[in-house]
Amino acid sequence: MASSRVSDLPHQRGIAGEIKPKNVAGHGRQNRKVLGDIGNLVTGRDVATGKDVAKKAKQPQQQTKAEVIVISPDENEKCKPHFSRRTHIRGTKTFTATLRARSKAASGLKDAVIDIDAVDANNELAAVEYVEDIFKFYRTVEEEGGIKDYIGSQPEINEKMRSILIDWLVDVHRKFELMPETLYLTINLVDRFLSLTMVHRRELQLLGLGAMLIACKYEEIWAPEVNDFVCISDNAYNRKQVLAMEKSILGQVEWYITVPTPYVFLARYVKAAVPCDAEMEKLVFYLAELGLMQYPIVVLNRPSMLAASAVYAARQILKKTPFWTETLKHHTGYSEDEIMEHAKMLMKLRDSASESKLIAVFKKYSVSENAEVALLPSLDDFSVSCA
């Protein structure tokens, strides 16, 4: 069958046998067979014979093969280290840093002032080149946007009721395990709201809940839910009331939440109190939170004053001499005489904290997690040391 099928196709055999290359008149060149020679060069070989077809197929590859140039380093020349632009930039002083250094030299800055930002020179998040300008801005803002004396304009609220509210908020803050920034912002919102509008006594705790809800949303990664605040208040208020108070607070403060609280200055001044260990840091925050309970200390003074006074009092208690260094004076902007009276007030609060009915702050700093700084012995000769 196979042979009969082949014999049935004579025209195919004729095509295969009869097609011959024709000469082009006047040129003496042969036509190229289909896929016989796809090159443009004339080799003079007979394509029809089929000889050297493989060689012709490889020939263009040999002619068009890219030349690889291998560069070998000179044996007598040493290899240069890899140049990193990022490393080069880090090792070079920026224009801002140069101007700041010249400004310090022009202002006659003493060598006794320690550069507390040197350890963060390579930390981009620390913003070392701008940190001094940032805190100068904070000092300006706290003077312009201070909280006015509002107790006289609140007929149903007095200083004692405010202290009770702050004591309860400290306890709620501890139970929710919130960040320190949240507590300071909460108290700031409470005082600012009270200075702007009248609040009834029965709504004072609701004000604290709304302020802490806002502070949590602003500072925390995982903020407690509204129902958590309803539960912590023993269902004294419902969800709708808490949300309504939140909206009212934001409206009164005009959504201005980014404010310099005492915590902002505490973080900076603790860093300036070199050397500073964990015990001293906890003691500074303990004294500062005791100050938050007192209306005159918080409302009638700037946040930076409370922070500086807490650092000074802590150094007195731990007998870190000198009590007020040139570094602290430079970064706080306060002299020792300016903060001494406020430090005495914090010391008195500390001495009476264990006997007070409002013991949330005392309990918070009596545990090992906070170095038990609330249990440190009192400093009887504090007034003598300050004299």
Curated annotation (Swiss-Prot):
InterPro entries: Cyclin, Cyclin-like_dom, Cyclin-like_sf, Cyclin_A/B-like, Cyclin_C-dom, Cyclin_N, Cyclins_cyclin-box. This is Cyclin-B1-4. GO terms for biological process: cell division; mitotic cell cycle phase transition. Transmembrane segments: none annotated. SUPFAM superfamilies: Cyclin-like (SSF47954). CDD domains: CYCLIN_AtCycB-like_rpt1, CYCLIN_AtCycB-like_rpt2. Keywords: Cell cycle, Cell division, Cyclin. It comes from the Eukaryota. The keyword Cell cycle applies. The keyword Repeat does not apply. GO terms for molecular function: cyclin-dependent protein serine/threonine kinase regulator activity. Residues 1-29 are annotated as: Disordered.
